[in-house]
Amino acid sequence: TGLSGSGKTTIARALERQFFDQGNTIYMLDGDNLRSGLNSNLGFSFEDRKENVRRIGEVAALFARAGFIVITAFISPFAEDRKKALAAFKDNSYEIYLSASIDVCEKRDPKGLYKKARLGEIKDFTGIDSPYEIPTKPALILNTDKETKEVSINKLYKEITLPGKMSS
């Protein structure tokens, strides 16, 4: 979880590649691929954001029950929704917080979403005019505005592959 532009998709894709190259069955769910398909009927209201995260959790659980390692890369702005989504996985899930300042996220913004939000063209944009609840007890915090992509990926990989962390 983290703001738009914090590096969620970048880190998730690299981690997916690392696990795949080791022969694992893995799938990454990303905000863009679900918003353009399964969740295309949802907007960005409070209720729609809650429903978006609920659906993500359900889809991720289906993949996990089928034996996949599942990586989700979503803003997921509300703590209660993240908690519910993670509950489906019992002890075999990790909330990872990608921390980056709003200034850095805006500079990284390839789609110009922050600019549109600041101009009022996008309403309820997380971090601008809609809240983001920072995780209080994530399994790991990646400071993506202070460390390289490679450092973040290595920290994350080490955290989730510690003995006893992943079930086979």
Residue positions per predicted region:
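Conserved beta-strand scaffold positions in the cores of enzyme catalytic domains, especially
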Residues: 28, 93-95, 139-141
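Small-molecule kinase domains that catalyze NTP-dependent phosphoryl transfer to phosphate-bearing small molecules
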Residues: 99-102, 107-155, 162-168
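Conserved substrate/cofactor phosphate-moiety recognition/catalytic segment
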Residues: 6-58
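Hydrophobic pocket-lining residues that define ligand/cofactor binding sites across diverse proteins
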Residues: 19, 60-63, 160
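Generic alpha-helical structural signal
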Residues: 13, 53-57, 79, 83, ...
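Helical mechanochemical/support elements of P-loop NTPase systems and associated helical scaffolds
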Residues: 30, 48, 52-55, 81, ...
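ATP-dependent NMP and nucleoside kinases share a basic, alpha-helical "lid"
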Residues: 25, 37-48, 60-118, 124, ...
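Residues at the beta-strand->loop junction immediately N-terminal to the Walker
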Residues: 1-4
